[in-house]
Swiss-Prot record:
It is an enzyme of class 3 (hydrolase). It holds the Pfam family RuvX. This is Putative pre-16S rRNA nuclease. CDD domains: YqgF. GO terms for biological process: rRNA 5'-end processing. One of its GO terms (cellular component) is cytosol. PANTHER family: POLYNUCLEOTIDYL TRANSFERASE, RIBONUCLEASE H-LIKE SUPERFAMILY PROTEIN. Belongs to the YqgF nuclease family.
Amino acid sequence: MRTGVRLAVDPGAARIGVARSDPDGILAIPVETIRRGPGDLDRIAALVLEYEAREVIVGYPASLSGAEGRAARAARAFAKALARRLAPVPVRLVDERLTTVTAELHLRTGASYRKRGARGGRARRSVIDQAAATVLLQNALDTERRTKLPPGELVEGTP
């Protein structure tokens, strides 16, 4: 398995959840939530530099039928823009089906989530966004370890 930090982003309409791996590429760790809009790609680029990430994983919300819907097209467009901004760092699209649901189910059992949830919906959504990015990245790392192949689809225009 390849070593080196990977960064995962789970882009949504309003926010982007971010997670990173440890340097050995074994464990995914939540990082932060970025507000969508001007400067979001710059913030991700800064995180790539800060963590010396070797690759960025972008969540791709394929439908359960496998068809590319509106959200999947938006994720692909975001990944292409990110790939242009981050070149030569590779960007990969990885299936994120049900990551947010999985993240929320895991979080609901934790006391810290309930405490954060008491502060309001915005804080809770921020935690969920980071957790979804963490689930996405952990799934990608586990897939690579199992298959011995990089996960997902390399975004056009990346090395």
